[in-house]
């Protein structure tokens, strides 16, 4: 949540809970939350800001003081009318891809946008069609979550804090 000036919620990190429970953020006292028309988190926290803070974080509210973070509104891929949240699909891929990677959308004449997977690797090649399914066969993906292409990029663009610059890395392919 890059728009916020301080923490507004906490997520339990220990493993003494179900996977579903481990994904839930609980808001701190004197913080209230809601969502806007896009499904993005809206924060009311007078100790943090006198103004209501609207983020680009897609969330699902699970009670008056808890939410499940889904991803970023600005990374959603609309592929053939299906809205795909890359961060949710990436969770499924993290166990089978050892290199750094991310999912993003590229323009597509038929679908509007197509989901593509970028992997940081020196292979400098592209996989598509059956090759993608074979590469990702161990992932538990729905038919819409399979990327149409896999691009291997030698080195991802990064911020000073080593976060992946998704947009500029995507422009490299």
For each feature predicted by the language model, list its residue ranges.
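Conserved AMP-binding/adenylate-forming
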Residues: 1-66, 73-76
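Short beta-strand-to-loop capping motifs
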Residues: 12, 45, 119-123, 154
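General small-molecule cofactor/ligand-binding pocket signal
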Residues: 34, 102-104, 150-153
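Generic structural signal for well-ordered beta-strand positions
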Residues: 42, 68, 159, 164-165
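AMP-binding/adenylate-forming catalytic core of the ANL superfamily
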Residues: 53-145
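AMP-binding/adenylate-forming catalytic domain of the ANL superfamily
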Residues: 140-163
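Phosphopantetheine-dependent thiolation modules in NRPS/PKS and related acyl-activating systems
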Residues: 163-173
């Amino acid at each position: 949540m890059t728009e916020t000036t301080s923490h507004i919620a906490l997520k339990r990190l220990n493993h003494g809970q179900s996977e579903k429970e481990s994904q839930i953020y609980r808001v701190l006292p004197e913080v209230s939350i809601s969502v806007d028309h896009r499904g993005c988190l809206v924060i009311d926290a007078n100790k943090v800001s006198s103004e209501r803070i609207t983020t680009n974080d897609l969330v699902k509210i699970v009670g008056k003081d808890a939410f499940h973070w889904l991803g970023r509104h600005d990374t959603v891929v609309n592929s053939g009318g299906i809205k795909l949240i890359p961060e949710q699909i990436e969770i499924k891929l993290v166990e089978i891809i050892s290199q750094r990677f991310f999912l993003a959308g590229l323009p597509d004449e038929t679908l509007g946008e197509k989901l593509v997977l970028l992997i940081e690797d020196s292979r400098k090649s592209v996989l598509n069609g059956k090759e993608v399914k074979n590469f990702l066969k161990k992932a538990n993906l729905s038919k819409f979550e399979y990327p149409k292409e896999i691009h291997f990029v030698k080195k991802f663009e990064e911020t000073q804090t080593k976060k992946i610059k998704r947009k500029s890395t995507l422009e490299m392919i």
